[in-house]
Amino acid sequence: MNHLGVFETRFRPRTRHKSQRAQLIPEQITMRTAVLLPLLALLAVAQAVSFADVVMEEWHTFKLEHRKNYQDETEERFRLKIFNENKHKIAKHNQRFAEGKVSFKLAVNKYADLLHHEFRQLMNGFNYTLHKQLRAADESFKGVTFISPAHVTLPKSVDWRTKGAVTAVKDQGHCGSCWAFSSTGALEGQHFRKSGVLVSLSEQNLVDCSTKYGNNGCNGGLMDNAFRYIKDNGGIDTEKSYPYEAIDDSCHFNKGTVGATDRGFTDIPQGDEKKMAEAVATVGPVSVAIDASHESFQFYSEGVYNEPQCDAQNLDHGVLVVGFGTDESGEDYWLVKNSWGTTWGDKGFIKMLRNKENQCGIASASSYPLV
């Protein structure tokens, strides 16, 4: 036998009999299982603890950022549950946005701890049924009808913010005074166009003092009623002299601190988006009422808002159209200023679908004051 053969023989590894190996395998599996199962259990616990920590950290940040305080521990647990449910809905919608199935994103905002019906009761204060009833019963509730200007070609886009005609985004708080903010916004724009001076006007003046004109303070009102009050009253006070409180208070209008006045208002033909675009382009910001009754509006963040469930007759929220345009995908939109603060939407604004059969009723009740 050669040296190689000797080497192979001397150093050949010992082998176990087949039956011995068969006995060893179950023992090895049992030992490995005994080691792995506790490790897996620890890992699962660690992940669960980690997830719970993340959730509570998000909740803590939310409460801190939006200054949330609850009556007791029971209410806080209830609000945390709503917060987590809303977060799940938002994440689900945004996954559809990432897949290109919807044209706008949602985000957690200060309303994330509210049930949707609570949110609607608190924030949406426009009554379209009352609007129609008043106009049908009395001609004085109707304004001058808008007539298209001659020889005007509509621009591709308009943004009155860049022209200095729009005040900073305001916050109505937990008060259904959207109609007052829409009214002041339109008059602020018209006053600026006439005087060249942008003056922030008092929503609280309208909340407190225009009840005889059919408005109901924090429980809702109509922009046209506000314009009628301002005309008959000889003006509206400045925001600085009559600051916002987000409650119904006694009227303390002061003629010495009037910021602007009007001499009536103009109504744009119902449902006519083309005429409304002409008014926005040539006149300035326009008061409108919309259907804002959907959760998608509550948590809107960016993109062109396209809500197929919107109703052109179910109008419950007053806002201000400050421009229009077309986005990079070719979608026409209205540029709308809301009154829910800068943490809502796109820094307080929303792009709403334009030229799509009057979606959300944006052209159903539009008007602006005459100055």
From Swiss-Prot:
Catalysed conversion reaction: Specificity close to that of papain. As compared to cathepsin B, cathepsin L exhibits higher activity toward protein substrates, but has little activity on Z-Arg-Arg-NHMec, and no peptidyl-dipeptidase activity
Keyword Hydrolase set for record: yes
A Gene Ontology term for the protein's cellular component: late endosome
Primary location: other
UniProt GO BP: digestion; proteolysis; proteolysis involved in protein catabolic process
Signal sequence range: 1-48
Chain positions carrying an annotated carbohydrate: 127
Subcellular location(s) per record: Lysosome
Active site per database record: 178, 317, 338
Top-level enzyme category: hydrolase
Positions of the pro-segment in this chain: 49-153, 327-329
InterPro entries, per the entry: Papain-like_cys_pep_sf, Pept_asp_AS, Pept_cys_AS, Pept_his_AS, Peptidase_C1A, Peptidase_C1A_C, Peptidase_C1A_papain-like, Prot_inhib_I29
Disulfide bond residue pairs: 175-218, 209-251, 310-360
Disruption phenotype: Flies exhibit wing and pigmentation defects. Females are sterile, males are partially sterile.
EC number: 3.4.22.15
Sorted UniProt keywords: Developmental protein, Digestion, Disulfide bond, Glycoprotein, Hydrolase, Lysosome, Protease, Signal, Thiol protease, Zymogen
One Pfam family of this chain: Peptidase_C1
Keyword Electron transport included in the entry's annotation: no
GO molecular function: cysteine-type endopeptidase activity; cysteine-type peptidase activity; peptidase activity
Tissue distribution: In the embryo, predominantly expressed in the midgut. Also expressed in larval alimentary organs such as salivary gland and midgut including gastric caeca.
Purpose of the protein: Important for the overall degradation of proteins in lysosomes. Essential for adult male and female fertility. May play a role in digestion.
Subunit structure and binding partners: Dimer of a heavy and a light chain linked by disulfide bonds.
Similarity remark: Belongs to the peptidase C1 family.
PANTHER family: CYSTEINE PROTEASE FAMILY C1-RELATED (PTHR12411)
Official protein name in the record: Cathepsin L1
Organism listed in the record: Drosophila melanogaster
